[in-house]
Every structure is written in C-alpha cells, then in structure tokens.
C-alpha cells in the first residue's frame, strides 16, 4: 500500500472546474501545476492509505467549510500564477 495525499485530487478537480469557466488564463501544464502547487502549499494535506480511507475523505471533503477553503485557495492560485506565469 502507498500513502497518498487526497487533497491533490480535490485541488486538481477544483482547478479544472474553475479554469473551464475562464478563457483569459493560460492552461498549459506548467501553469496548471504551478497553480496546484501554490494551492496545495496553503491547504492541509489529507493523507489516505486504503480505498475505505478514500471514501471517508471524499465524504469529509463535502463539508462546506472544507470545500470553501479549497475553492478560495485555488482561486487565489489562479490569480497569482496567471499574473506571473513562469514561461
């Protein structure tokens, strides 16, 4: 078994959703990875080991404050990285 930070999935899904609504922002792999990294460094990790842990984490992710925190940090990441792309 491996240890996995489930927050990566949550941030990736949120980023994809928010970027799909924006036509004015670079969506290259470098920018997307920079945005993910920026947001992940500001959010608490959610480590899991088993599929049961994955399901529990998925349920916890649905809590309103947790979801709001992810959306807030991903939105900030998009704003910050898109204003200073590294390419």
Where are the language model's segments positioned?
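Charged, amphipathic alpha-helical regulatory modules used
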Residues: 1-87
């Amino acid at each position: 078994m491996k240890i996995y930070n489930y927050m990566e999935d949550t941030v990736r899904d949120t980023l994809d959703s928010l970027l799909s609504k924006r036509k004015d922002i670079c969506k290259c792999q470098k920018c997307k990875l920079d945005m993910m990294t920026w947001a992940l460094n500001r959010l608490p990790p959610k480590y899991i080991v088993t599929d049961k842990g994955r399901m529990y984490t998925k349920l916890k992710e649905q809590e309103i404050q947790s979801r709001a925190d992810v959306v807030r940090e991903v939105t900030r990441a998009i704003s910050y990285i898109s204003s200073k792309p590294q390419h």
